[in-house]
Amino acid sequence: MTDLSDIRREYAKGGLRRADLPQNPMDLFALWMTQARDAELSDPTAMCVATVDEQGQPFQRIVLLKRFDDTGFVFFTNLGSRKAQQIAANNKVSLHFPWHPLERQVSVLGEAQALSTTEVLKYFMTRPKDSQIAAWVSQQSSKLSARQVLEGKFFEMKAKFAKGDVPLPSFWGGYLVRPKSIEFWQGGEHRLHDRFIYTRDNTQWIIDRLAP
């Protein structure tokens, strides 16, 4: 077994205090997202999306956050993908934003709700044309005999859609994750990290500090 126990670091970028917290967690998330973008982090919108299958086996993958507001967090995917199939059976999911250079992370527990075709189309039309074509090509999570099969289909579809707009595939969609709780983690000195969790109580958010 490879021993990694000597890899460690100190966290000294500053703490997080109760007095600094807004009542709405999405306000704090918006601030932290802005700061992550201003710091020019690599893929600041990247988040880990966790789902479970019908046997309770968890799966995780990195997906890009495309929109957020007070209602929740939006991402898009192939509706035939493993994540979409698992959401159809159990829409409870978790999201995780790992902003390591800022010594921060955000964890979200919530329920995924399918977006309307109108909402999906509105976003789909903003994608680069090659990305739109790629959505038609990949049967996400299915097995491939070789990469050449995927590339061949891409160029076939690229020729097919050479003129005009690329239509929205019926098997491509998106989700709004409505948060039930949002935890903010800020690294602290001596491993005394600051953790605050917002838990939804009807129309209000309850704020609690958690032990590190």
From Swiss-Prot:
Gene3D superfamilies: Electron Transport, Fmn-binding Protein, Chain A (2.30.110.10). GO terms for biological process: pyridoxine biosynthetic process. The keyword Oxidoreductase applies. Substrate binds at residues 8-11, 66, 123, 127, 131, 191-193. GO terms for molecular function: FMN binding; pyridoxamine phosphate oxidase activity. It catalyses: pyridoxamine 5'-phosphate + O2 + H2O = pyridoxal 5'-phosphate + H2O2 + NH4(+); pyridoxine 5'-phosphate + O2 = pyridoxal 5'-phosphate + H2O2. Its cofactor is FMN. Keywords: Flavoprotein, FMN, Oxidoreductase, Pyridoxine biosynthesis. FMN binds at residues 61-66, 76-77, 82-83, 105, 140-141, 185, 195. SUPFAM superfamilies: FMN-binding split barrel. It comes from the Bacteria. Its EC number is 1.4.3.5. Pfam families: PNP_phzG_C, PNPOx_N. Binds 1 FMN per subunit. The keyword Transmembrane does not apply. Pathway: Cofactor metabolism; pyridoxal 5'-phosphate salvage; pyridoxal 5'-phosphate from pyridoxamine 5'-phosphate: step 1/1; Cofactor metabolism; pyridoxal 5'-phosphate salvage; pyridoxal 5'-phosphate from pyridoxine 5'-phosphate: step 1/1. Catalyzes the oxidation of either pyridoxine 5'-phosphate (PNP) or pyridoxamine 5'-phosphate (PMP) into pyridoxal 5'-phosphate (PLP). Belongs to the pyridoxamine 5'-phosphate oxidase family. Homodimer. HAMAP family: PdxH. This is Pyridoxine/pyridoxamine 5'-phosphate oxidase. It comes from Shewanella sp. (strain W3-18-1). The lineage of its organism: Bacteria, Pseudomonadati, Pseudomonadota, Gammaproteobacteria, Alteromonadales.
